[in-house]
């Protein structure tokens, strides 16, 4: 079974579209875990209503909104995941109908996998939001729209996955076995700021563990719903500094993760 973890924060309309896209998946042996970095009542009601609307398992994990704690609730979802493999997506990315299937066919022990996403433009995003039923954008529709990185939306199922030595994951679209997540102790909860760090951190720790990284470009396709970019150079700088310190330490297993540890385990290169 696959555990699909969705990181969400307040965007209820986007989650509704994501759940519709999940309901269109060709591969059905999965569960959905919604990791909410907050406790929005409207979000809770949508998820509660979704239990009777969809024929897949939906679990909801949340905590009080006191700032950026996405990593903490993400670890809670990992802890409770029942699948042998875990896929991570963000709460503003709808999925191609064969998204989960392509991950399922590719994933294996000793490796982790990632994809990219189409950046939907404001007009096409509004069109999707305004429709009561999701119609997944076709490649032609993407070409004729105001979207960017459209080439990422071309589905090429016969394309071979490629090992990527110098290409890191994006936190919005990647997957790995739960066992490997436990071996590195999940996400490092020392990352308490947005913009930079937590996904790159777990990426290098999985490589340090000995895993190989593979691209599933043009196979595990996402469509990112438009919203204004929120970025802070100062916050990014602080996250980058912490990330560099962690890499200099060189430990695959973080202390402040799923478990709270006092002794680090170092793995040989």
What are these regions (language model features)?
Residues 20-29:
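Short, acidic, metal-binding catalytic loop of nucleotide-sugar glycosyltransferases
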């Amino acid at each position: 079974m696959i555990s699909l973890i969705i990181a969400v924060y307040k965007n209820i309309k986007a989650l509704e579209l994501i759940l519709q896209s999940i309901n269109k998946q060709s591969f059905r042996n999965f569960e959905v875990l919604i990791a909410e970095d907050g406790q929005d009542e409207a979000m809770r009601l949508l998820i509660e209503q979704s239990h009777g609307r969809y024929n897949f398992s939906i679990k909801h994990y949340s905590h009080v909104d006191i700032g950026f704690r996405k990593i903490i609730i993400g670890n809670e979802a990992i802890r409770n995941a029942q699948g042998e493999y875990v896929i991570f997506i963000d709460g503003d990315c709808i999925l191609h109908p064969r998204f989960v299937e392509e991950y399922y066919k590719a994933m294996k022990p000793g490796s982790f996998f990632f994809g990219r996403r189409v950046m939907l433009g404001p007009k096409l995003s509004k069109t999707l939001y305004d429709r009561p039923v999701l119609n997944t954008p076709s490649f032609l529709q993407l070409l004729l729209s105001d979207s960017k990185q459209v080439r990422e939306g071309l589905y090429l199922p016969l394309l071979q996955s490629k090992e990527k030595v110098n290409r890191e994951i994006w936190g919005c679209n990647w997957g790995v076995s739960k066992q490997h997540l436990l071996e590195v102790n999940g996400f490092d909860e020392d990352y308490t700021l947005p913009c930079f760090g937590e996904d790159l951190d777990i990426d290098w720790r999985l490589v340090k563990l000995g895993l190989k990284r593979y691209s599933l470009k043009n196979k595990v396709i996402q469509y990112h719903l438009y919203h204004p970019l929120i970025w802070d150079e100062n916050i990014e700088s602080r996250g980058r500094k912490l990330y560099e310190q962690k890499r200099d330490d060189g430990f695959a297993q973080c202390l402040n993760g799923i478990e709270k540890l006092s002794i680090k385990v170092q793995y040989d290169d």
